[in-house]
Amino acid sequence: IRRPPRSTPLYSSAASDVYKRQIIDSAGALDKKRLVRNVVHQPCIFEYVYFSRPDSTLDEISVHKSRLRMGDFLGDKILNEYKNIDVDVVIPVPDTSRTSAMQVAYKLGVKYREGFMKNRYIGRTFIMQGQNTRKKSVAQKLNPIEIEFKNKNVLLVDDSIVRGHTSKKIIQMVRKHGAKKVYFASASPPIRYQNVFGIDMPATKELVAHNRTIRQIKNYIGADELIYQDLESLRLSASIGNPKITEYEDSVFTGNYCDSYVTKDYLNNLEKRRKDVSR
């Protein structure tokens, strides 16, 4: 069987979203028969934060524009609540955070720079098994460009912070390359709870924000200051694009799961299965 190389594009045109209670049959037709009871449509907010490509449109919401708005809200929060920090340059942790980071720099009126070379043969570190593997992979995945960090107060912007190991390692690398101060901003709120709807996220106890304050997280990752996006601002970043959607699946931030089968026993069993035995 001959397959096209991975870089070969599959051209398509946007048609519509496939919603709950809908399927596409083998002939390519959209079947709108009622398959399950009527439920409130709650898109996963993490799609807009991280998983979806920026050129995607989900539920009539542009992922790119939603990330621009995340940067707007994050920049406003820094200006209003963190007036003590003096930022020389904003640098994204590639790749997903680029859009938000550019908007943060615009809001703050400072330079935006690319500060990392990325090895694209290393996968997503937050789903890798084993802390040693993750630490090694971060060092292999990102290589700092020293001239962008040396003798500067740097604001690093990432889409989210999961275990905190990646953020901690990146901050250490940046300091090693001469940064005077390292501030860290997350385009999403603290991730405090595990995901049960398809994202292979760590067990709750492995999440850096679980049972930690913002100050404790800041100290753990070694940042001079840590700024998180507010949950309401994140929701607005998406809902401005489609006001018809009023609820989102945001349980990783709130612990409020939208299905009744997600009980405490279910979560405990899931925790056991996901426990990272390689640590």
Where do the protein language model's features map onto the residues?
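PRPP-associated nucleotide enzymes
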Residues: 13-279
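Single conserved hydrophobic/aromatic residue that forms the stacking wall/gate
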Residues: 1-15, 19
